[in-house]
């Protein structure tokens, strides 16, 4: 089966692909990328300062090769829907994903490693792996980098979830209303854990 990268598709053609073939979408390979993780930091001053740690390069091969992964993306750490619903819900239902044949669940956002780590600690996230895409390079390659000027966010990720098998995207749930002008109410309809779990369990 042929595969192709999303970066080679225009926004219109990517949307048409998902609309026309839906659940039978042809897999496409994610772009090779190196993420900048931060490990080993200790908390100081109530968790606002991190010291003693080091930078660690983590590649897409490390994260996705020979694994079945659910990854969800969101506009930003510490924001209302992301903090109150999406991230904690995925963490709470982590075992259900494992039972459905998933190896790992990842949360990715256009935030740096310090922010992602602090957010996970603040919400007491125990299971979901936090992936920092500080420069938005990976998010851009997924066709999901958008501008959110009304909130003063700058470039962030549009909200989505995806099922990735051995580095190939095999299912993609994108929230409606994709735009670059903040002309939306930050929809959260299809990138929730229940939608992905329903899809996974129907395939078992």
Predicted segments, located by residue:
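Chalcogenol-based redox active-site neighborhoods
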Residues: 2-204
């Amino acid at each position: 089966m042929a595969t192709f990268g999303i970066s080679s598709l225009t926004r219109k053609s990517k949307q048409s692909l998902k609309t026309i073939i839906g659940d039978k979408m042809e897999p496409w390979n994610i772009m090779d990328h190196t993420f900048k993780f931060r490990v080993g930091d200790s908390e100081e001053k109530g968790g606002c300062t991190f010291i003693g740690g080091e930078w660690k390069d983590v590649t897409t091969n490390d994260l996705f090769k020979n694994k079945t992964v659910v990854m969800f993306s969101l506009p930003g750490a510490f924001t209302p829907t992301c903090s109150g619903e999406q991230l904690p819900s995925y963490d709470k239902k982590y075992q259900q994903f494992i039972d459905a044949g998933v190896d790992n669940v990842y949360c990715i956002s256009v935030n740096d490693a310090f922010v992602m780590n602090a957010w996970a600690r603040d919400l007491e996230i125990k299971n979901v792996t936090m992936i920092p895409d500080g420069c938005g390079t990976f998010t851009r390659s997924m066709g999901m980098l958008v501008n959110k000027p009304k909130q003063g966010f700058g470039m962030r990720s549009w909200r989505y979830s995806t099922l990735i098998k051995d580095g190939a995207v095999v299912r993609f749930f994108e929230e409606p209303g994709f735009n670059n002008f903040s002309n939306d109410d930050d929809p959260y309809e299809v990138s929730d854990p229940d939608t992905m779990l329903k899809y996974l369990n129907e395939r078992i």
